[in-house]
Structures are given as structure tokens and as C-alpha cells.
A protein has these predicted regions:
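Structural preference for solvent-exposed beta-strand-turn elements
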Residues: 1-366
């Protein structure tokens, strides 16, 4: 293999692809990236048996070929090369020669035969969505994905496509986030995408470009400009999320989002990694009163907000409360409550583009 490529193109591609590379694997080749030189393109792939990222960049190919090279080392070398033009060449001993300006490296590579094939699958459904919409949907829900592997199904989000509407639902047992957008698609299907995959998708999405999603029985493919991201799907039965949203609402308040975040954030100063006391919220009259008592002290605050319905005193985990509020994209939110032991519902003042639920914490005197 012998080729010339631009360092800026190579560095960006290697940086993005390397995120799918195993940091430690029983298969040594998976700690590397796969380079394939054919036609006028250099293909670059990373894969950890769960998620694979592949891209193609322009290159001047003198000799076609393939090689696997350490992702960590190759990334560092490319990032620090002195000139814009990079020459990459391999020999029959799997030695890779990297040259740029006066700098040159000789790196031991591996045969591409040792690199596992990325999955292929038969497409059962497909969807095209604007990158901006998908980015906002993932960003406003992925925070609620579980990191507890005892229930693997909830380490991903449910993508629920029906009635020309796509909903993304994430739940971890303490909070739930739902975001929906209308799409030009008649399919009715559901699939569960790992949270890790969604995080990688976020880093690649361009707001102006459409993302093409191809779904199979066990895998999903996201086509994002020059990048292809293939991931396994999570298998199992996801919670009937619609039934978990309380129907009754005894108390409602419309609140300025930024003011609410600031108040809860101030209460959070009394909590930390080893201290977790509930933020006590009293909805009454024309205000919401906040307090927090922990082993290091006490704090009190209040904000103005018209409260409709019954007065209620309720406690929440400060981090869960803040996560929900910080992923809202409206200036005001509606808070709905059904007593002190039922989940809090956060929605837009108008419409239903998002729903966030936060399960309360028991208060000692409630």
C-alpha cells in the first residue's frame, strides 16, 4: 500500500473513528484501526464488536492495499506531523512507513485478515431525518439512559416510530425523558439503540445534513455525511412508557426555566458525591420554596411562580432535577404534580414535544 493524503483530513477521520476502537481487547487487531486504500479513497475503520465507525477520505493512491495499525499510536503520530502532506506506505513485513516533511516513522502493523468483519445485515426499515432534529432529540433524552448493566435494556433508548412521528424514550428507574418530532415516514417500528452509540452519533452529526438510518433485526446503521456508524441493537422488552405518565394533576405551575435551574443549583451546593439529601420543594400560592438540609448545613431559597391547584411539599434528587431542566429548550416549563409521592412531570407550556419525569425522594415529615 502506498498513498498520499492531507494531514488535516487524516487527523479528523482518525480522531472520529478511534472512538469505536477497543482500549483493551483479547483480539489485538481491535485495538487498531483498519486502513484500506482503493481507487481514490482511503477507508478508515474502528470497531469494538459493539459499535463500528467507518469513513472515506480523498487520497492519491499509488498502490492499493490494507493494514491494521495501533489506533492510539497512529492518532498521536498524525496529530503531531509537521507538514500537510502525509505519505503512508507498507511493505510485505507489515511495516508501515509514515512520512511528513522531515519526520518519518516505521510502525509495526498487522494483517487486515486479523481484523473482524464489521456486521452486514438485511434492512427491514429505514428513516431519513434532519441532523439538527436527531441531534436535539438525542441530546435531550440520553441523560436519562441507565448506566446500570443489571438491566441492559435500559442502557439504551427506545426509538418508537409510528403515525409519522419519531419518539426517543430513555429511562433509568429514577427519571424518564421523551422527545418527539414529526417525520416523513409511514413505518411503524420500534428498536433500542445503546446510549454509547447515541453519544458517538452526537459527535458526528452536522445540523445541515440529513441522517439516514437503516434498521435490521439486530443491527442499525447511521449514515452521517462521509461516516457510517453501525451498532448492535439491544434486545428485550422495553417498559410501556405511556402507562408510567400520571394522568391526574393536582398541582401545576408555570416556571421560568433559568430561574428554576438557578434555584435548584443553589440548593445543590449542600450535596456532593458522598452527601445526597433531597431538595425540598413547596409549591404554594405564588411561589416555590426550596430548602436542603445535609450534614454540612442548611440552605433556603424561593422563586415567584403562580401555583394552580393544591399546595404540595415534595423532595427530589438535585442532580436528576437539574438534568431534566438543563435539557429543556424552552424559556418556560410547566411543572405538574399529583401529590408528594408521584413523579413530577416537566413539559412545554404549549405542545408536547418533550416530557420529562423525575421520581421524588421521600421526605422525613411527609
Amino acid at each position: 500500500m502506498k498513498l498520499n493524503v492531507l494531514r488535516t483530513d487524516l487527523a479528523e477521520a482518525v480522531n472520529n473513528v478511534s472512538r469505536a476502537v477497543s482500549s483493551k481487547s483479547t483480539i489485538p487487531a481491535l485495538e487498531g484501526i483498519l486502513l484500506k486504500a482503493y481507487g481514490a479513497k482511503l477507508s478508515i475503520s474502528g470497531y469494538d464488536l459493539e459499535i463500528g465507525i467507518t469513513t472515506n477520505i480523498d487520497a492519491t493512491i499509488q498502490e492499493q492495499g490494507e493494514i491494521v495499525i495501533s489506533a492510539r499510536l497512529f492518532s498521536e503520530i498524525v496529530r503531531k506531523l509537521p507538514e500537510e502532506v502525509v505519505c503512508i506506505e507498507t511493505d510485505e513485513r507489515m511495516i508501515t512507513y509514515i512520512t511528513s516533511g522531515q519526520a518519518d516513522y516505521q510502525i509495526v502493523g498487522m494483517s487486515s485478515v486479523e481484523y473482524p468483519d464489521l456486521p452486514t445485515f438485511e434492512e427491514t426499515d429505514s428513516l431519513e431525518i434532519k441532523g439538527e432534529f436527531l441531534r436535539d432529540m438525542i441530546r435531550s433524552t440520553v441523560y436519562a439512559v441507565s448506566d446500570n448493566n443489571s438491566k441492559p435494556i435500559y442502557t439504551g433508548s427506545l426509538f418508537d416510530l409510528s403515525d409519522k412521528t419519531l419518539k426517543i424514550v430513555a429511562i433509568d428507574g429514577y427519571r424518564m425523558a421523551i422527545r418527539k418530532e414529526e417525520v416523513d415516514n409511514e413505518s411503524n417500528t420500534q428498536f433500542i439503540v445503546p446510549g454509547k452509540t447515541q453519544q458517538e452519533i452526537l459527535k458526528l452529526i452536522d445540523d445541515e445534513e440529513n441522517v439516514v438510518i437503516s434498521v435490521g433485526q439486530r443491527h442499525i446503521l447511521f449514515k452521517i455525511e462521509e461516516y457510517s456508524v453501525i451498532s448492535r441493537l439491544l434486545e428485550g422488552t422495553f417498559l410501556d412508557y405511556k402507562s408510567t405518565i400520571p394522568k391526574d394533576k393536582k398541582t401545576e405551575a408555570v416556571v421560568n426555566t433559568r430561574s428554576l435551574i438557578s434555584a435548584v443549583d443553589r440548593m445543590s451546593l449542600l450535596n456532593g458525591d458522598k452527601i445526597q439529601s433531597p431538595v425540598r420543594c413547596v409549591f404554594s400560592g405564588d411561589e416555590i420554596r426550596f430548602s436542603c438540609t445535609s450534614t454540612i448545613g442548611k440552605a433556603n431559597d424561593k422563586i415567584s411562580a403562580p401555583v394552580m391547584g393544591e399546595d404540595v411539599e415534595i423532595g427530589f434528587n438535585n442532580r436528576y432535577f437539574l438534568d431534566a431542566l438543563k435539557n429543556v429548550d424552552t424559556d418556560e416549563v410547566k411543572i405538574s404534580l399529583n401529590g408528594s409521592l408521584s413523579p413530577m412531570i416537566i413539559t412545554p407550556v404549549k405542545g408536547d414535544s418533550f416530557v420529562a419525569l423525575v421520581v421524588p425522594m421521600r421526605l422525613s415529615n411527609v
